[in-house]
Amino acid sequence: KQIPSLKHFSLYSERDTDKYNELIVPLVYRMTNLEELNLHLVVYCEKRFIGGYDLTRNIISRLLQLNKFVFNIRSRLPLNDQAYLSSNEDSQRSFNGFKNNKIISCVDYFPDRKEGQCHIYSYPYPAKYYEYITNNFPDGLFKYVREVSLYDERPFEHEFFIKIAKSFPFMEKLTVYNNKPQMNKFDERSKDDNRHLSAIQYPYLRLLDLFDAHDDYAEQFLLEFKTCLPIKLNLHVHFSTLSRVTHNFTRNATRMNCAKIIDSGVSGGNSSTSKQLLKDYVSDAKIIFSNSVE
């Protein structure tokens, strides 16, 4: 049944769906007089990513009254020995017919997970979250985004975090998913090597989740010459990671940033001695220990 009276429609979903063609596209077809459409989706695809050709065929050509189309679609694709994998250039080229919008696309492939990802969105980006950013992140200013997650099977280097801080100046929550060690490491003893580094500022950051990150990323955020953390930070991290990065809670170069932690969710470190070492090092923080497997 058609819905001709509907002029504006928005659909936001952070959960994956594999029913894009079966449910979402037919739903939009019913809105024959739609003038404004907002789609924010994560779609699991079987054969190909969602791109400009798909949106033109299934959305734009069907909605003749449409004058504003805002979208943020991240599609996922299993890697099954496909003969051809589309590139970011292919994805961007599919939007050549979008005359009234600046469209950004970012295509990535993850061999370990055997999965591909294509993130397409109209810019300026209106959402409050930006998920699974990779090293291919194309820059830009995202002043509405408050929650960010990073994922890649290649390491994130210091320069990448500079880019993230500049692109998301009002970021409040950051989650890092990356088990690959950094290639370009710097030590507080190597002062000559560190001269070109600038301590990255995250003035609005309130929650930093490093549960699924290599130790190097805890070091990236806790070393004072790499990062200047804000006060009242909530840190989620494994006890073993924190112990190694702080040299068993004796390292001076991590002491300043650790002093800014007000809440910390820590997995492991169940002995009374371990707990006391951490509490002495992060003296002002409320620490919640869990028995999660590290």
Please provide the spans of the model-predicted regions:
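Eukaryote-biased activation of long, low-complexity terminal tails and linkers
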Residues: K1-E294
